[in-house]
Amino acid sequence: MHNLRIVFAGTPDFAAKHLQALLNANLQVVAVYTQPDRPAGRGNKLTPSPVKILAVEHNIPVFQPENFKSAEAQQELAALKPDLMVVVAYGLLLPQQVLDTPRLGCINVHGSLLPGWRGAAPIQRAIWAGDPETGITIMQMDAGLDTGDMLHKMVCPITPEDTSASLYEKLAIDGPEGMLFTIQQIADGTAKPEKQNNELATYAKKLSKEEACINWQQDAAFIERCIRAFNPWPVSYFKLADLNIKVWKAEVLPNTAQQSPGMIIQASKAGLDIATGNGMLRIKQLQLPGKKAMSFADVLNARQDLFLQGNILP
């Protein structure tokens, strides 16, 4: 395993944790691929990815092609003579020629129990759908979207309190463990690929800011799941008096009186109670424009005028 020439491809912090695990295990990472530096922050300053920052700290050569379609990018990879490519949240499609370049192929760490939630937002969609569990799948990559043979799975329960942020943290522990286990099996020749059942496939489409706008006609339970799924991005919100108010935390209560969806039933230090299509949502933490996220009790002290009982939110 320690003789394998590994190329790592990844971009966000989730991927950086996997690169760190490879380094901690003293594996031979001969190069890192990550997305080009992007503008970030208020100054729109070009910012390197977490994976690039870690690679530079460890003096690992970094490559940042815009895509892998060019012959130059493909030749650069081939010149590294990789045995294995490990891909974690890289964000670029890999053509077949790239997948065929490493002697042992390319493996991917995916944040779901495949074939469920193939695609861009598996962790968020698992919460959004109310799944009781998710996990990590290590797969041998092919040209399809998360369709490759499965090499290893690890199951992770989803608690009623989990947000996408907290679930990411859990899977960022399981993922590196599963990755190292799989690399060892590949090195030993003991990996047992398992085909995916395409009939059971579901797709985790990207999240959008438009999707994060709360529709009070929907069930309180579904809205509450969206709030957790869209934390930390794009963050659920509702409109009130020309303000977009972000919602960070809520709970579901029964709505026995059956008021109109969107009606403010009461505003108290316990929270902001709003009728929905089924049940009542109590908002516990929200964020006014230009302010920090605060408990509703603190917001109420400053802006009681916004949350008048009987008002109906759009």
Curated annotation (Swiss-Prot):
Gene (UniProt) = fmt
Instruction: Give the EC number.
Output: 2.1.2.9
Catalyzed chemical reaction(s): L-methionyl-tRNA(fMet) + (6R)-10-formyltetrahydrofolate = N-formyl-L-methionyl-tRNA(fMet) + (6S)-5,6,7,8-tetrahydrofolate + H(+)
Would you indicate the residue range of the signal peptide?
none
- SUPFAM superfamilies the UniProt entry points to: FMT C-terminal domain-like, Formyltransferase
**Record carries keyword Transmembrane helix:** no
Record organism:
Tolumonas auensis (strain DSM 9187 / NBRC 110442 / TA 4)
Q: Which domain of life is it from?
A: Bacteria
Q: What is this protein called?
A: Methionyl-tRNA formyltransferase
Could you list this entry's UniProt keywords, alphabetically sorted.
Protein biosynthesis, Transferase
Residues bound to (6S)-5,6,7,8-tetrahydrofolate = S112, L113, L114, P115
GO terms under cellular component: cytosol
